[in-house]
Structure formats: C-alpha cells, structure tokens
Amino acid sequence: MADTTSKEVPLHSVQVEALVVMKIVKACAATYPTTATGSIVGMDSNGTLQITNSFPFPTADVAASDSHPNDHMAASNIAAAAPRSKANIVYQSEMIKMLKEVNVDANNVGWYTSANMGNFINTSLIENQFFYQKEPNERTVALVHDVSRSAQGALSLRAFRLSPNFMTAYKEGKFTTENMQKSKLTYKDILVELPIIVHNSHLLTSFLHQMPVELPKKELDFPASLADLTRNTPPTPLYPNLESLDLSIDPYLERTCDMLLDSIETHYTELNNFQYFQRQLTREQAKVTAWKTKRAAENASRATQKLAPLPEDEWERLFKLPTEPSRLEGMLNARQVDQYSRQVDGFTASITGKMFAVKSNLLPEQS
C-alpha cells in the first residue's frame, strides 16, 4: 500500500546528496569537453526523489596521438548514447547488484549527463530519458550538469523529466502538424524541470556547526608616529577596483550568442524544409483535384451512354503525396533557442549598463 500511495504522488522535487554532487562534478570535469554520462540511484519518498549515489558509465577511449578532428564528436556521440546501450545496461545492473550487497540504496532513479554552454537539448537527451521513463509510473529524472557554467563559480545542476503529453506523442511517433494541433503540444511542453535540493548528512551538518565561525582576531599594532608609518610602508599599495568598469564582454555571453545564432539558423533551415514540403503537397493536391474533376466528367459522359463508371480511387496509385517531415527536430531546436535566450537574458543585466555608458560617451548629443 505504501508503494502504491508513493507512486500516486507526482514528483515535485529532487534531493541530491552532496557526495553525489561532487561525484557528478568530478566525472563531468574529467571528460570535458567530451560528454559524460552515468547512472544515479536512490528512492522516492512522498514525491521527493532522493538521490543517494551515482556511478559513471564506461566510455570508449580515443587515442590522442593519431586523433582526427572528428574523434571528439564521435566520442561525444558514443557517450551520449551510453545510457541506453546494451553493454551499459548490463554494467548498470551489475553495479546495482553490488550496491545491494553493501546495503546501499540500489533503486535506479535515472541518469546524469554533462553539458557545455547550456547545449543539452537534443535527440540523445530525449531518447535516453524516454528509455528510463517509458515504463508506467517510472520515477526517473535526468540530471544535467553544465561544466562551463559551473566553472564560473556557481554550481549548475538541473533535473528534468519528459512531460506526459510529450511521452504520449513520442510513443506514437507522430510529430505531424495535425497531431500537434490536436494535442496542443509545443516546444514548452517537452521537458518539465524539477527543483533540486542539495542535502548533507546529519554527521556532516554537525561537523559544520561545530567548526569555528570566526577566526581568532589579534590586536593590530598601529603606528605611533608618522615616522613609523613611513618606515614600514605596505609592500602593496591599495588601488581602486576598476574591474567593474572593464568594457570587455563576458566570453561566456559571447559564446552563448554565437550558439544562439547557430540555433536560429538551424530553425530557419527546418522552416525552409517544411515550406518546401507544403509547396510540393500543394502541387500534388492540385494534380489530384484536376484528375478527379476529369474523371468525374468522364463518368458523367459514360453515365449518359449507360456504361459502367470508372473507379475514382485510381489517383492513389497514380499520384504519391509527399510525407510530412517530423516536427520533432524543430521542436527541440526551438526549445534550445529558448534555453539560450534565457541564458543571454541572465547575462545582459551587467552588460547593458556598460553599453549605455559607452554610447553616452561616444554619442553625447543623443544622450
């Protein structure tokens, strides 16, 4: 009864142990810029997914001596598909079996992956999460650790699940315009983000509380006269902090803008492909309409002659309507554009003031 009640409560948050966070950060940083993936284990407690341990998936090593420029991309593609490969499924089962032997939570609750500059919304992420989440009431999440963002001093760790509407559409495999309009599925409905809580053990929390809060202070010996101050000149004079006036734009923002432009270009490519399909469909439908009109006139003429009418469904054999391309790639790209836009919006607060300051100095008559 307890398990049934727990599954009926939807997931509303993810609690990650601090040790697991350190393991994920270390594993992702060790393989950067190649994608790193791994499995996470834990348990579900009243809608809170508690992640208590993790281990990385083994990846294929690429020789650095005779490496090819495409070897990095090949290694990243292999690592991105690692969570659903047969070899890693067996490896994950063996690891969970060994964790059970040492009395560790051995329930698989998802997987983790690394990201670079917020670029993680792709087909591999969807396929991996669908592989874990496809079972009914499967309580799994995907943890995404952005290595480049975390290198700036703030941990970037996010938890995602596929939305129920997207899961239904992905099972059917029909991402056509008609089906998307019926289900009202948009790029915003692909992923559902859950808040993450970093949890420490009671032993570690007690240790942190017992540590001295303030360092012992000792009295400073102030100079008694001007001669003492002149004689003991500080080796490093105090300079004003001018870093806030630096006009150079954050390289992370520049790179994010470049990737945003690439995603927008990809979006227009997908849009042009869909427009080409619509033009082809319109031409074929016009041919079918003309053929049906001609056949209807022939049948009317044959009816006056008391002859058997000709079949009116032969157009299906004579004409082949083009198949609508899947809109999944376009949806994922639109979601990635939204992700980049949010990142740019978070960086423009400190940059906008500098840009207006430069404009007022260069163009004082317009200020």
Swiss-Prot record:
All copies of domain MPN, residue ranges: 14-166
Origin superkingdom: Eukaryota
CC annotations in GO: eukaryotic 43S preinitiation complex; eukaryotic 48S preinitiation complex; eukaryotic translation initiation factor 3 complex
CDD domains: MPN_eIF3h
Quaternary structure (record): Component of the eukaryotic translation initiation factor 3 (eIF-3) complex.
Family membership: Belongs to the eIF-3 subunit H family.
Protein known as: Eukaryotic translation initiation factor 3 subunit H
Organism: Sclerotinia sclerotiorum (strain ATCC 18683 / 1980 / Ss-1)
